[in-house]
């Protein structure tokens, strides 16, 4: 008797089998020819990137820090999705290039042309596989990878005896801008400027540690607040600073007053708490977390960081589309008449194309962060250029 949990999976597999059998025989045959090179490409590129990115680091921790080998294997498995998702676009390029090159070299594509099958029709299975890999890449990148990387970090910290916290962050910085009175040669005037700057060296389980707050919002006076810890008091909607010192500096006369305190309530936004809960690296955020972080930065008046994050958000959507670009380019190159590409040649061509594409993406991303290009165009222009190049190659192959 099958368990209730297995019933949905059986239904899904049955539905996929029926869908597969409904496809034309030619599409099933061409798709089957792509699966072998696709799996080989995923395995090859994942093994290379995983070895360089994490294996050497774990081996060093096993040898020097006494990390148990079983825990190292567990961390390796949790880090695997992050490197697996990087291999999807590269494997798509390699699979389409090798698969169609082999069929072209054995004159099987020539036989299809002889019965009236167009080149565009031949590459449709490759584009379907590329679209499937695009969707899979987005799901991995947004759902699986962030949680897997967090679990890997927690597992490693636990094994090495570090403090484990579900909410944690380092170097939490939040700046708030506003209209404040500024004194100059013409007297006082209202201008938009930095009003408060909040900094905490560490954030653990809702508590900020080694906190410094600078307040420039009061005319003729600057205030600095230093505390060992700070927590958000929900009842008062204020920050509760503990075990610290408050220093007031009068601009005129350079007078300074200082006082120590055990507890001090300061009216400030809870935004630093949200910032502390977010991953510090945009690459480790989900789309929802990145949108929330961008909103916080925009509200804080940090235009440069907000723009950088808007670029990263667009890149989270544009990165999976690389599979479609590489699928179109690879199939267009492989479908050419008498195209013969060995596995080693396909690997080399794939590496060159991948390097060129990522170099172009890096350049456009830098222009977007600087503000030269809009975030949308900085992320999507490489995709549009790649698609245009792939369509040109497909047109050349159709002649």
Please state what every model-predicted region is.
Residues 3-28, 62-70, 299-303:
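Short, membrane-interfacial amphipathic segments enriched in basic
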Residues 304-397:
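Transmembrane alpha-helical segments that form the functional core of multipass membrane systems
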Residues 96-110, 115:
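Transmembrane helix boundary and interhelical loop/hinge segments in multi-pass membrane proteins
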Residues 130-254:
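Non-transmembrane, extracytosolic/lumenal segments of membrane-associated proteins
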Residues 80-99:
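Long, hydrophobic alpha-helical segments
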Residues 29, 33-37, 121-134:
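Start (N-cap) of specific transmembrane helices in multi-pass transporter permeases
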